[in-house]
């Protein structure tokens, strides 16, 4: 534990501004729209986060979270629902964060995109494009992403402005849309399965 007062920093996805919440450990939350500070390699444990992040949190062990009735997982990583989180979602090493209030009005496929984008940061680090493509690849492979869902994601992401670490929302939309079309045209639901982060059956395998 580091001495002195420190902060968790979340980049507000909708407005692209950094919002700070006082916490006892100096680190940064990887919000779903990205952060170049390497928060997937340093941060609190889920126990520390649950203790320090305030009231109304809800913990979901891996394999227990459902989004609109659909069971989701990010390997063996748990998820914390935090209705007061500054963005739609976030990630520290080993666990994900979703803002239950912010995602409430979104379509199912956009919610799954946000969750999968955060999961992508666990494997890909802070790179925005890689996390976006991880989410699209997972959506195609796992069968929850269709053409309408891709358009919903684009509508949602296109409102975001770019900054030093975020490509502009419309650019992200086009990158994801192009990749989605490539996956569909390739006729494979197993795109990228040779990559270690895509060969995931962790919830069916033995605990380590």
Language model features with spans:
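Bacterial N-terminal signal peptides that target proteins for export
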Residues: 2-12
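Bacterial N-terminal signal peptides
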Residues: 12-20
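Sec/Tat signal peptide C-region and signal peptidase I cleavage site
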Residues: 23-29
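Auxiliary, metal-adjacent structural segments of Zn-dependent hydrolase domains
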Residues: 31, 36-92
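Active-site scaffold of zinc-dependent metalloenzymes
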Residues: 80-107, 119-122
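Short alpha-helical catalytic segment bearing the HExxH-like zincin motif
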Residues: 110-118
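Catalytic Zn2+-binding segment of zinc metalloproteases
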Residues: 118-130, 142-144
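Long, well-structured alpha-helical subdomains associated
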Residues: 144-208
């Amino acid at each position: 534990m580091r001495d002195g007062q420190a902060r968790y920093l979340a980049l507000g996805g909708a407005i692209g501004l950094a919002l700070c919440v006082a916490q006892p450990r100096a680190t940064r939350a990887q919000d779903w729209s990205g952060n170049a500070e390497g928060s997937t390699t340093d941060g609190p444990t889920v126990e520390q986060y649950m203790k320090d992040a305030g009231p109304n949190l809800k913990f979901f062990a891996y394999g227990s979270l459902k989004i609109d009735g659909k069971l989701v997982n990010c390997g063996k990583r748990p998820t914390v629902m935090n209705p007061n989180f500054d963005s739609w979602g976030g990630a520290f090493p080993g666990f994900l964060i979703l803002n239950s209030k912010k995602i409430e009005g979104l379509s199912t496929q956009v919610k799954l995109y946000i969750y999968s984008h955060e999961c992508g940061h666990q494997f890909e680090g802070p790179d925005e494009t890689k996390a976006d493509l991880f989410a699209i690849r997972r959506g195609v492979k796992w069968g929850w992403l269709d053409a309408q869902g891709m358009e919903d994601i684009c509508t949602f992401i296109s409102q975001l402005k770019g900054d030093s670490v975020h490509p502009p929302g419309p650019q992200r939309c086009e990158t994801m849309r192009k990749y989605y079309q490539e996956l569909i045209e390739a006729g494979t639901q197993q795109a990228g399965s040779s990559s270690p982060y895509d060969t995931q059956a962790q919830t069916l395998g033995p605990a380590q």
